[in-house]
């Protein structure tokens, strides 16, 4: 065994001072001293349990001892009589075995392959033991779940990722998917439950047993987000539901995840074989599938952007040449050829890599370099995590942990270790780039005129600028020169290293050449230099623009077209990554795919890291907003589609925010107990105004109200029990907090909840019954007008149906025409006096006479006036489709409805484009005269003369 290095010998003295009397220094072996010096986790564990150290010294860890885990665990659980006891014993067993694994790993008593096997087998044994204990307990409580033939139904657990591949790292969360075979009901219990209820409750208890922190810690952090539909999907699915999902909706990334899926525990049963056979066609295609390369390239691009966004340059998993790239290389061959080559269907990386070499898909040399690099990186990763039992892949910056890793990896010092590490990662990167690297080859230095370089380097005399800037006016020439000079002065105030200077000197001549070719060069350059000032100290973003000429061209054209986009990019430079792929930049996410895209995006963020979750939500929104704006500018999205995309995006964000708030509240208080007998959450979010009407703009806030259906006597079922209605109030407050918290990426949305019953003076969240009562007995006419544009944007089916029924009932009430006309007209006049244009010779597109609000009031008046006779008028909440309904139901002439629709979309289109130019929503008085005259005539007809 290698002696401790000098820094570690010094640190040993600090360790000695912590040791209790039973662990006196003189009684410890050299091995014990080495491990205690290396790992604070082992040190803390044996201080709490000195008998573990005695056991380690007398019975050192063996390579094959994973075969005994099941028997050891069975003995540990033999006297467990309740769930609390189960949780305690599982946590202690996991910690005891992890100490043994850390000991073996630190001293290199066993191979790295053996360490990965032991870590994975330990997790599997703990998961299966917890499942089996809880299954018996739940059967005693509720009966045994059976199918229609009376056959008992088990809970099958798919271990995903490294757990499934038998390659779990030292401090890892576990990705699981729960499934049961067939529908049916429980038999033999005090009361009957259907199988879905049984397995959902059992699954919730299993997650709690494994995941909930106690004074003994936790067993594993459990991540269920890989299941169908993610967090918004059922916790447990039947085989039939799983099959339907993967056949009809399974995404490429879910296919990649399923490559490593492995059934935990006894995997030779009938149901296990059925599940495996069902999933295999989804994962391994019968034909050779080259579409995989582009899909994996896209995924790698997402990860590269994540590395840049979170500054993960020293990350041995996600960084260039890291563990993830080796996994991608192997998966390419599995997914392209695995359907035809059974040897490629292994879940584990190293056997698959051997099969790839045997099939001559990679050269023997490349395969061997990848194998050696993988084992080196995995050992380094596991050692790094075993220092503090901490889930990290980022190399340390402190001297102590660097000394620890250098010693444990058998190097003299840190530079020697990083030298070998760099060589391994370079080998991986080379193979990765040859196989699934970027489409574009490395960009060559373009032959730029020396004058552009001199212009940037400030060597041109004033007269010498004429050739390169000759097409610009004299004022623009002067402004361009001044902008370059000001930018260079700004650079002198900032700390930019040699690398940053070098990248800038390469980038700026290209940028100036492209910008100055434009007629609007001065305006465009002013917007781009403002952006560059914000990123000059972040060399990775400069490199992105320097190395990808296409990204630079997109940046220039977008900044020229829209100051809003320019300022967004300046505030949030991580959005620059979106410029890399024009296929996605000018092609927004499909309207029905925002939820799934967001779900995939959030999977990369730890579920329990609230700060990162908040950042990720905001960054996703900004990236999607950029795509929508880019498509709008390019003319590929008409105004109606712009609002559709902005609305679908907002709904996806609402869905994710409610999910996060719900998880946080349930973790703190448990669920309201009235939900035990029903599906759903008993909660709904209703969108009013532009959100309700599918008419969001780029900077629209969200008008929301919150409803629940919680009975007065309901309580939550957690350890910190609170009143059920108090739970929903806190849930709504949490949702508001998640929307409005300002992070480095800004806020998510401004949320206005004042349209709730009694406005700002009312409760933030209202019961469904109280909402209905208020609308029937207390609401003003303007509140009924608002209801015309309201719809549920998040909610379980029961509450959604209840709201829709109340809305329909209120809108179809008989109303006296003259009274309604007067009330609507007076409300509009009040608004115009309060909000109308204060600028002479200007037309406020939204608030002035003949503008958007007049059209909205006309449609709302006509729905409230005639829905009693024509209930179909209540179907839609957006103005365009309401105008269609008015024509279809013979309330309004078709010609008038179409003319109002054209006026409405024209005015809204102008508002969108003014927002892109960061201009207020008013225009010259002589604009849109025909549209305004048409709206005035319609207003006169319906709200004055009728």
From Swiss-Prot:
The keyword Magnesium applies. It is an enzyme of class 2 (transferase). Its EC number is 2.7.7.89, 2.7.7.42. Its cofactor is Mg(2+). Involved in the regulation of glutamine synthetase GlnA, a key enzyme in the process to assimilate ammonia. When cellular nitrogen levels are high, the C-terminal adenylyl transferase (AT) inactivates GlnA by covalent transfer of an adenylyl group from ATP to specific tyrosine residue of GlnA, thus reducing its activity. Conversely, when nitrogen levels are low, the N-terminal adenylyl removase (AR) activates GlnA by removing the adenylyl group by phosphorolysis, increasing its activity. One of its GO terms (cellular component) is cytosol. Belongs to the GlnE family. One of its GO terms (molecular function) is ATP binding. It catalyses: [glutamine synthetase]-O(4)-(5'-adenylyl)-L-tyrosine + phosphate = [glutamine synthetase]-L-tyrosine + ADP; [glutamine synthetase]-L-tyrosine + ATP = [glutamine synthetase]-O(4)-(5'-adenylyl)-L-tyrosine + diphosphate. This is Bifunctional glutamine synthetase adenylyltransferase/adenylyl-removing enzyme. Residues 449-946 are annotated as: Adenylyl transferase. Residues 1-440 are annotated as: Adenylyl removase. Keywords: ATP-binding, Magnesium, Multifunctional enzyme, Nucleotide-binding, Nucleotidyltransferase, Transferase. It comes from Escherichia coli O81 (strain ED1a).
């Amino acid at each position: 065994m290698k002696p401790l290095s000098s820094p570690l010998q010094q640190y040993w003295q600090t360790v000695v001072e912590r040791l209790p009397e039973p662990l006196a220094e003189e009684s410890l072996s050299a091995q014990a001293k080495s491990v205690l010096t290396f790992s604070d986790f082992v040190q803390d564990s044996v201080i709490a349990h000195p008998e573990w150290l005695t056991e380690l010294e007398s019975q050192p860890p063996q390579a094959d001892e994973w075969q005994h885990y099941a028997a050891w665990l069975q003995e540990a659980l033999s006297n467990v009589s309740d769930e609390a006891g189960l949780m305690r014993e599982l946590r202690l067993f996991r910690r005891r075995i992890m100490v043994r694994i850390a000991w073996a790993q630190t001293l290199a008593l066993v191979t790295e392959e053996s360490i990965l096997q032991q870590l994975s087998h330990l997790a599997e044994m703990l998961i299966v033991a917890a499942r089996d204990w809880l299954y018996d307990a739940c059967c005693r409580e509720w009966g045994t779940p059976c199918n229609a033939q009376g056959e008992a139904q088990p809970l099958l657990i798919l271990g995903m990722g490294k757990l499934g591949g038998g390659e779990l790292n030292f401090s890892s969360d576990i990705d699981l998917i729960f499934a049961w075979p067939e529908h049916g009901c429980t038999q033999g219990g005090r009361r009957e439950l259907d199988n879905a209820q049984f397995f959902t409750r059992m699954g919730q208890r299993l997650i709690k047993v494994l995941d909930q922190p106690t004074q003994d810690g936790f067993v594993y952090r459990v991540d269920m987000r890989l299941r169908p539909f993610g967090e918004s999907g059922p916790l447990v699915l039947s085989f039939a539901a799983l099959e339907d999902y993967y056949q009809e909706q399974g995404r490429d990334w879910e296919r990649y995840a399923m490559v490593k899926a492995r059934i935990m525990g006894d995997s030779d049963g009938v149901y296990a074989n059925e599940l495996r056979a069902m999933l295999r066609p989804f994962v391994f295609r019968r034909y050779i599938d080259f579409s995989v390369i582009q899909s994996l390239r896209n995924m790698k691009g997402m990860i590269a952007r994540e590395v840049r966004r979170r500054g993960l340059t020293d990350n041995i998993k996600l960084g260039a040449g890291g563990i993830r790239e080796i996994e991608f290389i192997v998966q390419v061959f599995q997914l392209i050829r695995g359907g035809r080559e059974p040897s490629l269907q292994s879940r584990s990386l190293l056997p698959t890599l051997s099969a790839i070499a045997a099939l001559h898909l990679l050269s023997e040399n490349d395969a061997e370099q990848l194998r050696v690099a993988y084992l080196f990186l995995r050992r380094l990763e596991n050692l790094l995590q075993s220092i503090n039992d901490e889930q990290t892949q980022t190399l340390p910056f402190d001297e102590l942990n660097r000394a620890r890793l250098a010693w444990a990896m058998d190097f003299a010092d840190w530079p020697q270790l990083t030298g070998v590490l760099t060589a391994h990662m370079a080998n991986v990167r080379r193979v990765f780039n040859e196989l699934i690297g970027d489409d574009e080859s490395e960009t060559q230095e373009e032959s730029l005129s020396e004058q552009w370089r001199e212009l940037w380097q400030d060597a041109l005399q004033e007269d010498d600028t004429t050739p390169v800037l000759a097409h610009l006016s004299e004022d623009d020439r002067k402004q361009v020169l001044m902008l370059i000079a000001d930018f260079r002065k700004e650079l002198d105030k900032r700390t930019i290293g040699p690398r940053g200077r070098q990248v800038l000197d390469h980038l700026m001549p290209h940028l100036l050449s492209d910008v100055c070719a434009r007629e609007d060069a001065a305006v465009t350059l002013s917007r781009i230099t403002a952006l560059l000032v914000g990123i000059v100290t972040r060399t990775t973003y400069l490199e992105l623009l320097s190395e990808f000429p296409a990204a630079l061209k997109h940046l220039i054209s977008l900044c020229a077209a829209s100051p809003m986009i320019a300022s967004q990019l300046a505030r949030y430079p991580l959005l620059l990554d979106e410029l890399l792929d024009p296929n996605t930049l000018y092609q927004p996410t499909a309207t029905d795919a925002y939820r799934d895209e967001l779900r995939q995006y959030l999977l990369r963020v730890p579920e329990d890291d609230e700060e990162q979750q908040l950042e990720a939500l905001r960054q996703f929104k900004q990236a999607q907003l950029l795509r929508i704006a880019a498509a709008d500018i390019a003319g590929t999205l008409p105004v109606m589609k712009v609002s559709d995309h902005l609305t679908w995006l907002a709904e996806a964000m609402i869905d994710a925010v409610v999910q996060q708030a719900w998880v946080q509240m349930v973790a703190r208080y448990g669920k309201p107990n009235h939900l035990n007998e029903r599906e759903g959450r008993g909660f709904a979010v209703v969108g009013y105004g532009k959100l309700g009407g599918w008419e969001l703009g780029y900077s629209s806030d969200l008008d929301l109200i919150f409803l629940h259906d919680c009975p007065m006597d309901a309580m939550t079922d957690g350890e910190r029990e609170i009143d059920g209605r108090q739970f929903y109030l806190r849930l709504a407050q949490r949702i508001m907090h998640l929307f409005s918290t300002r992070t480095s990426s800004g806020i998510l949305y401004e949320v206005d909840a004042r349209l709730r019953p009694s406005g700002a003076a009312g409760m933030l969240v209202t019961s469904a019954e109280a909402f209905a009562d208020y609308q029937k007995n207390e609401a003003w006419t303007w509140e009924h007008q608002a209801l015309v544009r309201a719809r549920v944007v998040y909610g379980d089916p029961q509450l959604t149906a209840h709201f829709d029924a109340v809305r329909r009932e209120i809108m179809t009430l008989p109303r006296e025409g003259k009274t309604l006309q007067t009330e609507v007209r007076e409300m509009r006049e009040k608004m115009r006096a309060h909000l109308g244009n204060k600028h002479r010779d200007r037309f406020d597109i939204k608030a002035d006479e003949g503008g958007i609000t007049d059209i909205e009031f006309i449609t709302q008046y006509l729905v409230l006036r005639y829905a009693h006779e024509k209930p179909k008028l209540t179907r839609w909440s957006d103005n365009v489709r309401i105008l269609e309904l008015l024509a279809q139901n013979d309330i309004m002439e078709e010609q008038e409805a179409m003319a109002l629709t054209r006026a409405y979309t024209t005015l809204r289109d102008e508002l969108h484009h003014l927002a892109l130019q960061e201009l207020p929503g008013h225009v010259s008085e002589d604009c849109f005269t025909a549209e305004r005259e048409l709206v005035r005539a319609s207003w006169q007809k319906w709200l004055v003369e009728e």
